[in-house]
Amino acid sequence: MTVHNLYLFDRNGVCLHYSEWHRKKQAGIPKEEEYKLMYGMLFSIRSFVSKMSPLDMKDGFLSFQTSRYKLHYYETPTGIKVVMNTDLGVGPIRDVLHHIYSALYVEFVVKNPLCPLGQTVQSELFRSRLDSYVRSLPFFSARAG
Amino acid sequence: MGGKCWPGARGERWRMADAVLFEFLHTEMVAELWAPDPDPGSGGKKKSLSVLEGLGFRVGQALGERLPRETLAVREELDALKFLCKDLWAAMFQKHMDGLRTNHQGTYVLQDNSFPLLIPMGSGPQYLEEAPKFLAFTCGLLCGALHTLGFQSLVTASVASLPACKSLGVGCLLPLNVVQALGHPHLWSLISAGKGNQINKL
């Protein structure tokens, strides 16, 4: 099992933070373009999923998987979106994504008076704590298929 | 962190609902006072620091009156300093100060290794230059509390590495009436005379 990468978007589609760990293949386009494509895809799929659902949805779109990776999605009431790509062996990680938001983003970005909200996160403390946390996860491993 | 919202029959103290309320309010006070000054020659930064210290002083005066109701009268310098390190710090930051040292000549160093208002900024040099403006209110707070307890003081803060507030140097504590008799030039000379001496752990 492994973690590939992680995106953090705000409600306006600004990519607040991007990290990668075991990403073997790049998209071949500038990072800014990649962020726009990712956000656009998430926006569309979220809208589509809620419209097509035959039942009332509680949490909405949570994840999708392809033949090679799984995308996990978590959205806060304020529109912050945490997106993590892992391999297929990783189960639901809603609690992990919630922890990244509540214990890392809120504590070290929202509460940091020198971090302007709505802009790319510059805090080294946030970056290092996020990296440490992801590396400590039981499913973080370099043995990617 | 949460607690009773009002004093009950058993005399529970008022408690802040959540420490983060104060943290956010403090952040906005600093941001407002550090907004870009249209007149760069007006000594804006020094003025902002003194305004923050003044706000802290007034809050410190009130807390000095409010908190020690159950304790005996504070007559000794050391009792006043212990009150700051324990009672005042607990009321403001839900923790105690990590260290208190003195040179036994009126200079005290109060140390907090994880000062709550600096914790979100990190542990490296990234925001070190910005730290002083987040300490001004607390310097005033200590000064105001001491004033209420009858001690005149000069409080300065320094940060060597975040989030430790390396020293809140409380200079030359004297009973208030003595200081007023001496006047400020003596106060300054007493403080500078005390600076070079060895500071010992209490």
Curated annotation (Swiss-Prot), chain A:
The keyword Transport applies. It comes from the Eukaryota. This is Trafficking protein particle complex subunit 1. Part of the multisubunit transport protein particle (TRAPP) complex. The heterodimer TRAPPC6B-TRAPPC3 interacts with TRAPPC1 likely providing a core for TRAPP complex formation. May play a role in vesicular transport from endoplasmic reticulum to Golgi. Its main location: Golgi. PANTHER family: TRAFFICKING PROTEIN PARTICLE COMPLEX SUBUNIT, TRAFFICKING PROTEIN PARTICLE COMPLEX SUBUNIT 1. It is found in: Golgi apparatus, cis-Golgi network; Endoplasmic reticulum. One of its GO terms (biological process) is vesicle coating. Signal peptide: none annotated. One of its GO terms (cellular component) is TRAPP complex. Belongs to the TRAPP small subunits family. BET5 subfamily. Keywords: Endoplasmic reticulum, ER-Golgi transport, Golgi apparatus, Transport.
